[in-house]
A protein has these predicted regions:
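Hydrophobic helix-coil surface modules that form long, contiguous segments used
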Residues: 1-99, 128-131, 140, 161-165
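Alpha-helical packing segments of well-folded alpha/beta enzyme cores
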Residues: 34-39, 98, 102, 106, ...
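Active-site rim elements
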Residues: 22-30, 115-116, 176-183
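Acidic/His/Gly-enriched intrinsically disordered linker/tail segments
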Residues: 123-191, 195
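Catalytic Zn2+-binding segment of zinc metalloproteases
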Residues: 102-117, 132, 136-137
């Protein structure tokens, strides 16, 4: 656990949690440290203090989503609690995921899309901002190299499949929503933001 002092002076309690059986492997201090690096970055970028009273990260088993934001609390697949020595690429991916979910506190939770048609905007922007935050606030200053060789490449591969779709897809029902949580919505959408900023 830890805390962060917001730009508006509030003390924001932070927690990082996992199953008791994983505690010997859990580097919760590093999770909190990455989060503390991202908080002031997002408060400055969004020109808005952290909008909730606390921030918890709960590492959970058998979680299909990978990670999911909720106001003041994020759930993350406990594969990110490393049981053996991880590659630095995996440690970097965890940092990006932590900062992706933190970005959603402002863009996704404080401000929420009206309907799932704008899923792409929610996820693409969080993916883009998490790489900006990683590159500018953490030791992974080459996060965009990783993005271009990983997420962007994955999106390009998915875009060549018969199941490709526009970044801004028409969402009629829950099934449409679920099939759009993919590399096109995340990686291709973030690539478009990257291009717009560079332009």
């Amino acid at each position: 656990t830890g805390s962060y002092t917001s730009v508006d002076g509030r003390n924001i309690p932070m927690g990082a949690y996992c199953r008791r059986s994983l505690l010997p492997y859990f580097d919760g201090d590093e999770v909190i440290n990455i989060t503390k690096q991202g908080m002031p970055f997002y408060e400055t970028q969004y020109k808005q203090p952290y909008p909730f009273r606390k921030y918890d990260q709960i590492f959970v088993p058998e979680y299909n989503m990978g990670a999911m934001e909720h106001p003041g609390c994020v759930t993350i697949l406990d594969d990110y609690v490393f049981r053996s020595k991880p590659t630095q690429a995996l440690v970097e991916r965890r940092a990006i995921t932590i900062l992706h979910e933190l970005a959603h506190m402002w863009f996704g939770d404080l401000v929420t899309m009206k309907w799932w048609n704008d899923l792409w905007l929610n996820e693409s922007f969080a993916e883009y901002m998490s790489h900006v935050a990683t590159a500018e606030t953490t030791r992974w200053t080459d996060a965009w190299v990783t993005f271009n060789s990983s997420e962007k490449l994955h999106a390009q591969r998915q875009d060549q499949l018969p199941s490709t779709h526009p970044i801004a897809a028409v969402i009629n029902d829950l099934e449409d929503t679920m099939v759009n949580f993919d590399g096109i919505t995340y990686g291709k959408g973030a690539s478009v933001f990257q291009q717009l900023v560079a332009y």
